[in-house]
Each structure stands twice: as C-alpha cells, then as structure tokens.
Amino acid sequence: KSKISLRKDILDRNGILISRNITAYHAAVKTSLVKDKKKFLVKVKLVLPELSTQKLRKDLNEEKYFYLKKRLSNDQKSKLWSLGEKGIIFEPFQARVYPHSDLYSHVVGQIDYDNYGISGVEKHYDYFLKDINNNKPLQLSLDTNVQFVIKTELENSLDVFKAKGGASLLMDADNGEIISLISL
C-alpha cells in the first residue's frame, strides 16, 4: 500500500496557486484476481499500447503483484477502471503539481518521491509545508503577474543579445520583499 503524505499549498502574494498536492494513481495487477490472462492482456494493451506485450505476459505468469503503470493520467485511470478487471488495483499517492512551473521552477524547487523538499522553497520550508497541525498555506511575497512580465522581458533580452542565460530580481526596497525572481 502506498502511503499518503500531505503537503500544504504554496501561494503567491495574491493567493494564486504555485504548488499543490493532488491525489493521483498507480495501476498495479494482482495476478490471482485475473481470470483470463489472454483477454486481460488484449484489453490492457488497448488502453496502454506502449506497454511491452512480452513483459506484460511474463509478469502475468510469473509475478503475484506488479505495477502495470505508475503515475496514470486521469484518462488512463478512467479507461483502465472501465475495463472492469478485478485484478487491476489503483494505488493512490500524493503528486505535487506546479501550475506555473515555467515561472517558478528555479525558485520553488521540487520534492522527492516521499514528499520531502529537495530544493528551493520546497526544501527551505519543508517542515512548515508538512506541518499537519496547521493547514494554513505558505504565502510567498512573489507576484505571479509581475513574474510573468519580467520573464517575458528577460526572454526577449536574451534573444536580442544572443545571451546563453540571465537572471532578474525585483525587490521592494521599503520592506525587502522579493516580488520576482527569475533565472533563465
């Protein structure tokens, strides 16, 4: 069984979502519940044609429990579920989504498979983001709208000057808050 590990949302200064956990699924197979392995193989291949027929056949015959596919899309989960196969087990897990990853990837960072922050804001505020006694989200001083405008201008400047990379920092001089931080 997969453990569910929750993590708080990260928001910008205006309450715009930067990062959130969602429940996603892995598909596993419990072979003792598969009645007709040939039919099962054909049905699964219709939904997941990228799977190796040979490996799937081998796993069905040699394994008691194996992963069919990790990190299913919603469409894949729905189609597999609609097959009505009792041998397909859906294991929930918490996946971290970053709706504005193109704007914040260097700043927000990422988490590992066990939901521990390994870089950026995710690492620095790891303890706070995992504190289940307080459901308040982490609100940053960053502004998504300003971040977008500055990123666009920085990209244009990189093109004009044929630069390999660039960075920008916008800080409120009165209080020290970071409004935008970009690295390209």
Tell what function each PLM region has.
Residues 4-48:
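Juxtamembrane extramembrane loops of integral membrane proteins
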Residues 5, 34-38, 70-74, 115, ...:
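Soluble non-cytosolic domains of exported or imported proteins
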Residues 6-16, 162-184:
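A short, well-structured edge-of-sheet supersecondary motif
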Residues 21-26, 111-112, 180-184:
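Short beta->alpha transition motifs characteristic of CBS
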Residues 45-49, 85, 112, 151, ...:
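Sec-exported extracytoplasmic/periplasmic mature domains
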Residues 46, 58-136, 140:
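Small/polar-residue-rich segments within soluble enzyme cores
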Residues 129-166, 171:
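Conserved, well-ordered alpha-helix/loop/beta-strand core segments that scaffold catalytic motifs
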